[in-house]
Regions:
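Helix-biased detector of long, well-ordered alpha-helical tracts
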Residues: 1-346
Length: 346
């Protein structure tokens, strides 16, 4: 299989067919584009969502929390708690766990989440630490109805394309970035984390609006998922997809496509009252821009000046590609080093 998330085709063929026979208590739609699950009991509707990250920097954990909790908030579910599972390399030490827990505690305090369970272990098959977060909440309005969006419904981007991935690249490869960029640029980029949209902020959206968090695969994957989930076609003004200049420059440095870069903390919003929604978002201090509208047909088109093209199926996330290429580069360096040692000993 390709690097990163399995394709929609594989998921439908190998996952969906297997689980359709059960799930009698679940009213959530089991679909590739869905990032949360719902279980109905006699008293309450429980909803949960999971997100995983991998990387050497302890700060990665906060992005998993933002993603998992944000997916609940996008469904108008207030996240209340998280459980955590961490896989370490066998060579890891206790300080790495302490660093992750410190950052986890900070982000959970900031977002009002309880930490209910933490499991950590090391294994010989782990190449870099993997953190999985499961967030849970209770649906406050279990009678929410699926809405059919009419042509002309506006699509708003709240947040910045590829910002999460940009921040994670700084965490993982600051030494590399310092070969090109000044310390002030690096510090300014780190402060961009304040532009990430948090779950509590998403819950402030008006009742009629529908939101969906971008994530793995970037804003283009988010648009595809939105179309799949809401059964809509649309026209998107590609030039309106907001990017931080720091994202542009860092993606250029690593030769990455920012529109395919993981974007947790940014949301796509459907609304029939675009002007009011934009005004309320901006008044609350959230970066937001109108990027397109729903069309009567199912076509998903991207317009960039005079060029119009159809939205492609989601591609692998650029951060996953970066990690893969980095690993291959390190392996090549190791082989060159081994060959040099062998040559010197002959």
């Amino acid at each position: 299989m390709r690097t990163g998330r399995v394709t929609q085709t594989i998921w439908n063929r190998s996952v969906k067919k297997q689980i359709q026979k059960g799930n009698r208590n679940s009213i959530g739609k089991a679909a590739w584009e869905e990032s949360s699950s719902e279980l109905v009991s006699d008293d309450k509707d429980f909803v949960w969502s999971s997100a995983s990250v991998s990387g050497k920097a302890p700060a990665q954990v906060k992005y998993a929390v933002i993603k998992a909790a944000g997916d609940l908030a996008a469904k108008r579910v207030r996240p209340t708690a998280v459980s955590v599972q961490i896989l370490f390399l066998e060579s890891s030490d206790e300080q790495e766990l302490k660093d992750i827990m410190r950052i986890l505690t900070e982000i959970c305090e900031e977002t009002g989440l309880a930490i209910t369970c933490v499991q950590a272990e090391s294994a010989e098959y782990v190449l870099r630490p993997v953190i999985q977060i499961t967030a849970v909440g209770v649906k406050e309005n279990p009678k929410q109805q699926t809405k059919k969006w009419i042509p002309g419904t506006e699509i708003i981007l709240c947040g910045y394309t590829g910002l999460e991935g940009t921040l994670r690249l700084v965490d993982e490869a600051e030494a590399d970035l310092r070969t090109r960029f000044t310390p002030s640029f690096i510090e300014k980029t780190k402060r961009c984390k304040e532009a990430l949209i948090l779950p509590e902020q998403v819950l402030q959206l008006t009742e009629e609006a529908k939101s969906r968090q971008c994530g793995d695969g970037g804003v283009l994957c988010g648009l595809w998922e939105l179309a799949e989930a809401e059964k809509i076609g649309f026209e998107i003004d590609f030039s309106k997809l907001a990017l931080k200049q720091e994202t542009v420059e860092i993606c250029e440095f690593f030769q990455l496509n920012p529109y395919l870069l993981t974007s947790a903390g940014s949301y796509l919003v459907l609304t029939e009252h675009g002007e009011e929604t934009l005004e309320s978002l901006k008044n609350a201090g959230f970066p937001a821009v109108r990027i397109g509208f729903v069309k009567e047909q199912n076509a998903r088109t991207l317009v960039n000046g005079e060029e119009t093209r159809y939205l492609d199926r989601p591609a692998p996330d650029e951060l996953s590609r970066w990690w893969k290429e980095r690993k291959e580069s390190e392996e090549q360096e190791d082989r060159r080093g081994d060959n040099y040692v062998k040559h010197c000993t002959l």
